[in-house]
Structures are given as structure tokens and as C-alpha cells.
Amino acid sequence: MINKPFSESCEQNKDPILSIIKQYFSEENTTVLEIGSGTGQHAAYFPYHLPHLTWLPSDTIENLQGIESWRQSTNLPNTLAPVTLDVSQTVWPVTSIDYIFSANTVHIMSWQSVESMIAGIRKILKPNGIFCLYGPFNYNGQFTSPSNAQFDLWLKSRNPESGVRDIEAIIQLAQTISDNGPLELINDHAMPANNRILVFQKQTT
């Protein structure tokens, strides 16, 4: 077993995030798909505090071993083995899901990948299902803090296709007319360190 990967930001944000998502991921016998589980820390922590549901971690293949190491260290009965998910692929490993959670992903991805992710979520999320998206966002094209502006510069220095996203663009993607029903923004929670949790609900068609 490899050493478990560790992110200090995941350690710091896990409790603030949990305080929000537990309000929405509340139904018994449901499953949460986590898109972009990264180090696996959230997938090891949240299911312990949400024993009424099953947590399904996912990420690209190079991150699965680290996620699995966290899963095995906690050995929680309601955490499934991580699955490979590349949001740019048209076929996902899940065809229907109750809830979806993703943290610190859309500012790392290219915009094309963000479009693919939102389209995939709209396809697999059940009617009235909830999607919680955590991370930094701009409002009216403006950064909400100097630190977010600096973070955006750092992201773009690593990959010009990355960057802090405009909330209006995310909402537009979520609501664009398609066969799979729109996602309506039902809440926008302020979080520590100039982050947000956007809460979307799948609308019935």
C-alpha cells in the first residue's frame, strides 16, 4: 500500500464543507458520486459522518491508487472503491445517481472539460437530485478577493486553460436547454478562504 496522499486544503475545508452538504445529502439509502476525488481525503471523511448514504469516489486513473489507500485505511462500509471517470468521455461509469459532489475541479479543468462535466451531470443525475460544487468563483467578471486573483494567475501559469470561473457561466451551462433537463441553482453558500458551495437541483422535464 502506498503512502496516502495529503492536501492541507482538504484537511482545512472538510468540516466547513460537511456542514453544508449534510443539509442536502439527507435521504436514506442514496448514493453520492464524487467527481475528482483527488487525494481521497474527502471520500474517507464524509461517509463516516453521513452513514445513511453510500459514497462513490471517482477520478482519472492516475489518482485512483491514492484514493483507494485512504478508503482502505478507514474501511468504511459505505465507501465504495473508486472508479475511473474522465469527464470528457461520453460514457461514464455511472448511469443514474442521487447526489453529486465535486470540490476544486472546475478551475483546474479546461473550459471544454467543464462543459463536458456539466453535460454528464445533467445526464446521470436523477430528477430532483442535488449537485454541490465547491471552489472559488468570480461574480460579474470580478474576483471576490486579491487572493483569488493571485490564485488565478498561478493557475494560468501552470495551464493557460485553467482559471477561476465566472458563476454566471456555470449557471448558464447548467440551465442550457437539452434533453436531460436543466440544473437550477437553489443556493450559493459562502465558505472560508473566499470559496463557495453552489447547490444545484435537477429539474424535471
Model-derived regions: residue spans:
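Core SAM-dependent methyltransferase catalytic element
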Residues: 178-181, 186-205
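A short acidic, Gly/Pro-enriched loop at the edge of an enzyme's catalytic core
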Residues: 92-100
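Class I SAM-dependent methyltransferase SAM/SAH-binding core
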Residues: 33, 43-90
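Conserved beta-strand signature within the Rossmann-like core of class I S-adenosyl-L-methionine
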Residues: 128-137
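Conserved class I S-adenosyl-L-methionine
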Residues: 28-38
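Short alpha-helix
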Residues: 161-178
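Class I SAM-dependent methyltransferase Rossmann-like catalytic core
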Residues: 1-27
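A short, conserved alpha-helix within the catalytic core of class I
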Residues: 109-121
